[in-house]
UniProtKB/Swiss-Prot annotation:
It comes from Meyerozyma guilliermondii (strain ATCC 6260 / CBS 566 / DSM 6381 / JCM 1539 / NBRC 10279 / NRRL Y-324). Residues 28-37 have a biased composition (Polar residues). The gene is YAE1. It is found in: Cytoplasm; Nucleus. Residues 65-105 are annotated as: deca-GX3 motif. This is Protein YAE1. The complex LTO1:YAE1 may function as a target specific adapter that probably recruits apo-RPLI1 to the cytosolic iron-sulfur protein assembly (CIA) complex machinery. May be required for biogenesis of the large ribosomal subunit and initiation of translation. GO terms for biological process: protein maturation. Its main location: cytoplasm. Residues 40-51 have a biased composition (Acidic residues). Residues 28-53 are annotated as: Disordered. Pfam families: Yae1_N. The lineage of its organism: Eukaryota, Fungi, Dikarya, Ascomycota, Saccharomycotina. May form a complex with LTO1. Belongs to the YAE1 family.
Length: 147
């Protein structure tokens, strides 16, 4: 029943049941040859479960960093797309507003409102793959009808 301490430094290993060495009491499990000096995991201020928590924390931080990076990239990409398309959208809005103003008070006004809704005006059919506007037949149709 001797402690495996060397030069006054305890490594927490003992070969028999609890033993008092000097003024220090050593506790350990009889089933383990490499036992802790702590009676339970709660006695260890560093927490024996730290190595199992570290990968989980690392995964959480990695995932959050990935999500933050994606969000930043999407925001900057969306802003660039907005800046490029703003002029086109503004021009279409002015054209639709002009048509609606010219048809105000006429029987054609209700038909113009139905046809010139935003989903029709900004439909993919009016744009190529690079989102450059082709001829906008709907706007041209209404402009020709009003001339």
């Amino acid at each position: 029943m001797s402690c495996a301490c060397q030069d006054g430094v305890c490594n927490g290993k003992m070969d028999k049941a609890t033993k008092t060495v000097g003024a220090e009491t050593h506790a350990y499990s009889k089933t383990s040859s490499n036992t802790s000096i702590h009676e339970s995991d709660d006695d260890d201020i560093w927490g024996d479960d730290e190595p199992t928590q570290t990968p989980a924390v690392k995964r959480i931080h990695t995932k959050q960093g990935y999500v933050d990076g994606l969000a930043h990239a999407q925001e900057s990409s969306l802003q660039a797309g907005f800046d490029e398309g703003y002029g086109t959208g503004a021009g279409l809005g002015v054209a639709v507003g002009s048509i609606l103003a010219k048809t105000w008070g006429t029987p054609a006004y209700d038909e113009a409102r139905r046809e010139l809704v935003i989903t029709n005006v900004l439909s993919r059919q009016w744009f190529d793959n690079d989102l450059c506007m082709k001829k906008h037949a709907l706007i041209q149709k209404w402009n020709q009808n009003l001339d």
